[in-house]
């Protein structure tokens, strides 16, 4: 069991109820003054809107749960998430098993690298948890159009642990990559259209960063765009790519880079299939390596098989 405060508990509860491996998610109030409060009193009693998450350790780890948690919060925002303000909307991780603290600390250390500001998420032993009123439980299931400050749909995207795919040193990268791969990933160059290795390949599998091996795209989201480069409607997870404004060649475009390796991948455009979200990730074949579905388990990517057709 772990207790997560991430702003309004309606969205946090609904998000975690959809995460594979979570057995139950219950809204409540935690770590305030005293063991009695309610929705009208929490701003006086100092409790945080918190979700009790019960999970199957054989299906999901605590670290994976915490990576999900950091996906849906702004960890640098004090007493504010989305449009909600007040100490009851602070972020926090409250544990009942001291052994969990080492994992929590590990995630904090990793996530601190992603932000310029200090992480202000509380981490503390659980003092008490008071179950919220019945009308708060499963609120968004009962009220599908109710207020929610997070994207619930992201719950179905896999969590990919960045620490498993560390970036090699500059020397190692130069030794590992071909001259063409190096020019594209490290010097932001673009390969030729219609003459690259994956533009017309649609076999089942995943595409990983040629530098780090971090998973980036799935064949399930690949489509024929006619542009001559591999095209995807989305990354395999929203966590694995970074975006940067690119004003080269007298154009304004959105560059796509890999998270762990910071490799230049390509650009994203808004002329993709409307029924798949409308985006087109135009990616250089030289920036990615294809892992066939049949090889994913043996190469350590078996946890992503459900993300592949």
Curated annotation (Swiss-Prot):
Concerning Gene3D superfamilies, the annotation shows: Peptide methionine sulfoxide reductase (2.170.150.20), Peptide methionine sulphoxide reductase MsrA (3.30.1060.10)
Positions annotated as active site in the UniProt record: 8, 282 (nucleophile)
What's a single GO MF annotation on this record?
Answer: L-methionine:thioredoxin-disulfide S-oxidoreductase activity
GO cellular component terms given for this protein:
cytoplasm
**What InterPro entries does UniProt report for this protein, alphabetically?**
Met_Sox_Rdtase_MsrA_dom (IPR002569), Met_Sox_Rdtase_MsrA_sf (IPR036509), Met_Sox_Rdtase_MsrB (IPR028427), Met_Sox_Rdtase_MsrB_dom (IPR002579), Mss4-like_sf (IPR011057)
- Report domain MsrB positions: 170-293
The UniProt keyword set, sorted, is:
Multifunctional enzyme, Oxidoreductase
Indicate whether Oxidoreductase appears among the record's keywords.
Answer: yes
> What segment(s) does the record annotate as region Peptide methionine sulfoxide reductase A?
1-153
Q: Which GO terms describe its biological process?
A: protein modification process; protein repair; response to oxidative stress
Reactions that this protein is recorded to catalyse: L-methionyl-[protein] + [thioredoxin]-disulfide + H2O = L-methionyl-(S)-S-oxide-[protein] + [thioredoxin]-dithiol; [thioredoxin]-disulfide + L-methionine + H2O = L-methionine (S)-S-oxide + [thioredoxin]-dithiol; L-methionyl-[protein] + [thioredoxin]-disulfide + H2O = L-methionyl-(R)-S-oxide-[protein] + [thioredoxin]-dithiol
- Enzyme Commission numbers on file: 1.8.4.11, 1.8.4.12
- Coiled coil regions, renumbered to chain: none
Q: Which Pfam families match?
A: PMSR, SelR
> What family is it from?
In the N-terminal section; belongs to the MsrA Met sulfoxide reductase family.
Q: What does this protein do?
A: Has an important function as a repair enzyme for proteins that have been inactivated by oxidation. Catalyzes the reversible oxidation-reduction of methionine sulfoxide in proteins to methionine.
Q: What is this protein called?
A: Peptide methionine sulfoxide reductase MsrA/MsrB
Organism for this UniProt entry:
Streptococcus pyogenes serotype M18 (strain MGAS8232)
């Amino acid at each position: 069991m772990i207790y997560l405060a991430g702003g309004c508990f309606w969205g946090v509860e609904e998000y975690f109820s959809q995460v594979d491996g979570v057995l139950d998610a219950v809204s409540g109030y935690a770590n305030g003054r005293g063991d009695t409060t309610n929705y009208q009193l929490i701003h006086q009693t100092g409790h945080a809107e918190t979700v009790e998450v019960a999970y199957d350790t054989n299906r999901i780890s605590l670290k994976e749960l915490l990576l999900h948690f950091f996906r849906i919060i702004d960890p640098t925002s004090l007493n504010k998430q989305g449009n909600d303000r007040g100490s009851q909307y602070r972020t926090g991780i409250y544990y009942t098993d001291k052994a969990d603290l080492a994992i929590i600390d590990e995630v904090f250390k990793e996530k601190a690298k992603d932000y310029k500001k200090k992480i202000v998420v509380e981490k503390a032993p659980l003092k008490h948890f008071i179950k919220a009123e019945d009308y708060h439980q499963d609120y968004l299931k009962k009220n599908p159009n109710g207020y929610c400050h997070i994207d619930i749909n992201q719950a179905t995207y896999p969590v990919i642990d960045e620490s498993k795919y560390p970036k090699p040193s500059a020397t190692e990268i130069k030794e590992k990559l071909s001259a063409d791969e190096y020019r594209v990933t490290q010097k932001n160059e673009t390969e030729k259209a219609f003459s690259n290795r994956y533009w017309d390949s649609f076999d089942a599998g995943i595409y990983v960063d040629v530098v780090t091996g971090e998973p980036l795209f799935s064949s399930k989201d690949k489509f024929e765009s006619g542009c001559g480069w591999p095209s995807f409607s989305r990354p395999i997870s929203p966590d694995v790519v970074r975006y940067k404004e690119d004003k080269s060649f007298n154009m304004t475009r959105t560059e796509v880079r890999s998270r762990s390796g910071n490799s230049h991948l390509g650009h994203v455009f808004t002329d993709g299939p409307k029924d798949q979200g409308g985006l087109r990730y135009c990616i250089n074949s030289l920036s990615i390596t294809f892992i066939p579905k049949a090889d994913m388990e043996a190469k350590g990517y078996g946890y992503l098989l459900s993300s592949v057709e």
